[in-house]
């Protein structure tokens, strides 16, 4: 039975998240419906990670086993035909060894968080960025962000309902880059805790607003208490952009 690796993009706004829910629309649910419509039997689609409600992806990766061999480009096109009109697209399909696991074979996950830093309302990117009207000191945010690099107990930046066995994670990259009104937070790690990226971003925004210093951010990390976290950034600015294998 061939195993296929799928690279997927989606607008997370209409979904309860990646994970299948019986009564709510999910990205996994519409993908599994498209696979079933293509191959004729119910088929589980396994993602590299469970993005939350409202979180987007330009490079989510999934795998599925289909009891029929398709040319990868034909499978991609068939799935896209059945995905319409949902805001989900299969960008690429590949046949991979049956040892490939979208989640467990992943070596690194790359996220970007997009902020528009201006007083004017959003006209074109509603639901795709976080508008922060107060001027942000992006240089201070970047300097503070480096205090989170490395292996730490990230309990402060972990959702209280996170089911991970350990709060320890190793953060490989956390950069803050400004281009005009656009402030982008770029982060890479092998894996993250539930809501970790949005919690870090929200706390960095406090630094950018002058409410916290870099030392305050480091103290919040060291506190290892969820209550020490700053604001949690909203989901609409977050994108899963790439998964490395």
Curated annotation (Swiss-Prot):
NCBIfam families, sorted: hisT_truA
Membrane-traversing stretches: none
Subunit architecture: Homodimer.
EC number of the protein: 5.4.99.12
Q: Which InterPro entries match?
A: PsdUridine_synth_cat_dom_sf, PsdUridine_synth_TruA, PsdUridine_synth_TruA_a/b_dom, PsdUridine_synth_TruA_C, TruA/RsuA/RluB/E/F_N
One GO molecular function term?
Answer: tRNA pseudouridine(38-40) synthase activity
Protein name per the record: tRNA pseudouridine synthase A
Keyword annotations for this protein?
Isomerase, tRNA processing
Q: Which organism is it from?
A: Bradyrhizobium sp. (strain ORS 278)
What processes in GO biological process is this protein linked to?
Answer: tRNA pseudouridine synthesis
Tell me the Gene3D superfamilies matching this sequence. Answer: Pseudouridine synthase I, catalytic domain, C-terminal subdomain, Pseudouridine synthase I, catalytic domain, N-terminal subdomain
- Isomerase among keywords: yes
